[in-house]
Structures are given as structure tokens and as C-alpha cells.
């Protein structure tokens, strides 16, 4: 355990966050996401919700400021519905740490899968919410 690191951030996830460069993307997936069939770098975060991970990551991770939307979530399939509280929980977790929230874009289901294939890694969580996946894009960490 390290001081200042959220307990939900595993050593493996901390290593991946440090390895990522600006513009790299990380998928935080729900428990139903086909992570192992679409990506070779999968980190398990069983029993931990996406909002909890977003809170921990937001303290360590600068979101990309040079794109319109550094967050991407899956659109509902036609005829299906989204629970707006899922996005609200995720943004509240980020806002708790950063004081503001980046913009979220909605991506068609299969386009989301294609984008996830090119991500730096996929973190499969214990999140049970339908359409509970989010892609986050890393930005440039400011020098202080």
C-alpha cells in the first residue's frame, strides 16, 4: 500500500496508468464486457465498481484536454434504454476529485468494441450496470 493511492488501484493498474502516454485510452468495463476476447492486456478489478475506480484514477490521471470528449460511453442499442444514473455516478466520482467533469461522448455498441480493441488496456470491473463501460483518454500531466 502506498500513501495517497486509492485502495481500489491495484499495483497492476498503477503500473498501466504510469506506462500510458498522452492520447492513450483505458477501458473501464462492466462485468459483462467481452474483455478477454477483444484485448490481450486485461486487468481484473472484480468486486469494484467503475465509479470507485474513476475516483481513484482521477487523482492520478489527467484527462485529455485536446479532444472534445475525453470520456466515451456506449450508446443504447435501438429499442433499449439507458439508465442516466450510471453516467451521473461516474461523473460525480470524477468531480469529487477534480472539481469538474470532462465531456462524455456516446458511441455505438460495435464502434465502442472496435475502439476498445485499440485501447492501451481493459480493466474488467465488478460493475453490474447495463451499459456501464467507459473509455477514458489520458492527457498531458502538467509539470509543477
From Swiss-Prot:
Molecular functions (GO terms): fucose binding; L-fucose mutarotase activity
Broad class of enzyme this protein falls into: isomerase
The protein's Enzyme Commission number: 5.1.3.29
A Gene Ontology BP annotation from the UniProt entry: L-fucose metabolic process
The family this protein is said to belong to: Belongs to the RbsD / FucU family. FucU mutarotase subfamily.
HAMAP family xrefs: L_fucose_rotase
Protein's name in the database: L-fucose mutarotase
Species this chain originates from: Actinobacillus pleuropneumoniae serotype 5b (strain L20)
Amino acid at each position: 500500500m502506498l500513501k495517497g493511492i486509492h485502495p481500489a488501484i491495484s499495483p497492476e493498474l498503477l503500473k498501466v496508468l504510469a506506462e500510458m502516454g498522452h492520447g492513450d485510452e483505458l477501458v473501464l468495463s462492466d462485468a459483462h464486457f467481452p474483455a478477454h476476447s477483444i484485448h490481450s492486456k486485461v486487468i481484473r478489478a472484480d468486486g469494484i465498481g467503475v465509479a470507485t475506480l474513476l475516483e481513484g484514477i482521477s487523482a492520478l490521471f489527467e484527462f485529455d484536454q485536446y479532444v472534445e470528449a475525453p470520456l466515451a460511453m456506449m450508446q443504447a442499442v435501438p429499442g433499449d434504454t439507458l439508465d442516466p444514473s450510471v453516467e451521473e455516478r461516474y461523473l460525480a466520482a470524477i468531480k469529487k476529485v477534480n472539481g469538474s467533469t470532462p465531456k462524455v461522448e456516446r458511441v455505438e455498441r460495435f464502434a465502442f468494441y472496435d475502439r476498445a480493441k485499440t485501447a492501451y488496456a481493459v480493466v474488467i470491473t465488478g460493475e453490474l450496470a447495463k451499459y456501464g463501460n467507459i473509455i477514458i483518454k489520458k492527457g498531458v500531466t502538467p509539470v509543477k
